[in-house]
Curated annotation (Swiss-Prot):
<dbReference type="Pfam" id="PF13804">
    <property type="entry name" value="HERV-K_env_2"/>
</dbReference>
<comment type="similarity">
    <text>Belongs to the beta type-B retroviral envelope protein family. HERV class-II K(HML-2) env subfamily.</text>
</comment>
<dbReference type="InterPro" id="IPR051255">
    <property type="entry name" value="Retroviral_env_glycoprotein"/>
</dbReference>
<comment type="function">
    <text>Retroviral envelope proteins mediate receptor recognition and membrane fusion during early infection. Endogenous envelope proteins may have kept, lost or modified their original function during evolution.</text>
</comment>
<protein>
    <recommendedName>
        <fullName>Endogenous retrovirus group K member 5 Env polyprotein</fullName>
    </recommendedName>
</protein>
<keyword id="KW-0895">ERV</keyword>
<dbReference type="InterPro" id="IPR029104">
    <property type="entry name" value="HERV-K_env"/>
</dbReference>
<feature type="region of interest" description="Truncated surface protein">
    <location>
        <begin position="1"/>
        <end position="245"/>
    </location>
</feature>
<keyword id="KW-0261">Viral envelope protein</keyword>
<keyword id="KW-0814">Transposable element</keyword>
<keyword id="KW-0946">Virion</keyword>
Amino acid sequence: MVTPVTWMDNPIEVYVNDSVWVPGPTDDRCPAKPEEEGMMINISIVYRYPPICLGRAPGCLMPAVQNWLVEVPTVSPNSRFTYHMVSGMSLRPRVNYLQDFSYQRSLKFRPKGKPCPKEIPKESKNTEVLVWEECVANSAVILQNNEFGTIIDWAPRGQFYHNCSGQTQSCPSAQVSPAVDSDLTESLDKHKHKKLQSFYPWEWGEKGISTPRPEIISPVSGPEHPELWRLWPDTTLEFGLEIKL
């Protein structure tokens, strides 16, 4: 992004991705004094890593709804557990199944960091603030895998799953999520609530509340970029879903 400004203008704000993509301010051919304003200059910039594209064009990452589940404090010890599902704009994964073999290919690229919690994050004492902490999930989602390159993300991707352990009859193991359930999404637009029922126990996969951090691993291995999701502010969709178990 290049925005023309003059010496009299206020500094501008530019939201960019990780600065490791661009070189440091080492070029001294730019105008250094007000009287040099308007002089012709040539600047060459070399990128160390391929850029990650966002949008609907081929080779770009697409937007999607990301879900997080938090526990709501119960009124009394005998009250049923209640959870709130909070959703916001994120990046669409190419693979949606937690047990898919494609995840295993990215294990060697697992970043260092705090592992995501094994339990559903609890709300803080202030009910208006969610527990937000960067963490590394047990498995990565593949955001892109084509001729443009392979991009993965180690942020948690909350989904509902059926626990089929010990079940004697047919049990669907696929996830059930507002991000992929059109009927549920449509009902949220009108009622903001939905009751989920199943003959099998529900489990919430990939616990934790963390931002997406896309990372290119092919044709070269690049750094994580935790700021890219902020480029979707104009299309952000946020809603709450109350679930009682």
